[in-house]
From Swiss-Prot:
Cytochrome c' is the most widely occurring bacterial c-type cytochrome. Cytochromes c' are high-spin proteins and the heme has no sixth ligand. Their exact function is not known. It holds the Pfam family Cytochrom_C_2. This is Cytochrome c'. PROSITE patterns: CYTCII.
Amino acid sequence: MKRMMIVAALAALTTTTVAQAADPAAYVEYRKSVLSATSNYMKAIGITLKEDLAVPNQTADHAKAIASIMETLPAAFPEGTAGIAKTEAKAAIWKDFEAFKVASKKSQDAALELASAAETGDKAAIGAKLQALGGTCKACHKEFKAD
């Protein structure tokens, strides 16, 4: 048992050290990538609705992927990554990080609601939840993303 605790402690220390040693520009590249993926998932959902595509479960799966990204998104904005590389992230993120986390959580919740609507197959409900998710994205961008 003692040995297991030592191994777990060393693993945690190693993980923390690696995270702290990461290149700040890599965080910028990472968050651009996941936010681009989020945008593409939303576009795919919109196309599926507009064109009435027969792609079973994809809308719910895409919405769940967005929710997963939003759940962990704040971790992609650690201290020391403001103004690194070419980024559209406003300093407001780090000035009021709690508000940024709340905005991310709102998007996560909206994405989960979209996933639930998608599982019913009700296109009107899916469309409404997609618009609601888009609204949370827009609100976050207004506050935290430079044009």
